[in-house]
Amino acid sequence: MDKELKEHGKELRERICQFITNYTATHSYAPTIREIGEGVGLKSSSSVHSHLTQMKIEGRIETKPYCSRAIKVIEKEE
């Protein structure tokens, strides 16, 4: 069960990355935490924040402190 939760978290973080990328391309600015939640089906802003924190640790996104629309997806180098 723990492995399933980890996989679900990875899939959700991938969806969050994709949502941020698509939203930014469409609007020319990043989404808020609430908009991300609405976009990926999470009701809790705290859950979105937790996933964003994990994504920062993994090096998948950058943020600016105290800025609500300052999330940047870091493209993976292959």
Show where each model-derived region lies:
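Short alpha-helical segments that sit at the start of domains
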Residues: M1-F19
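Short, cationic-aromatic polyanion-contact patches
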Residues: G9-R13, H27, T32, K64-E78
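DNA major-groove recognition helix of helix-turn-helix
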Residues: I20, L52
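Residues within the helices of the helix-turn-helix
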Residues: R34, T53
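Alpha-helical residues within the helix-turn-helix
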Residues: E38
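The short coil/loop that forms the "turn" connecting the two helices of the helix-turn-helix
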Residues: L42-K43
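Helix-turn-helix DNA-binding helix
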Residues: S47-V48
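A short, conserved structural fragment
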Residues: K56-K64
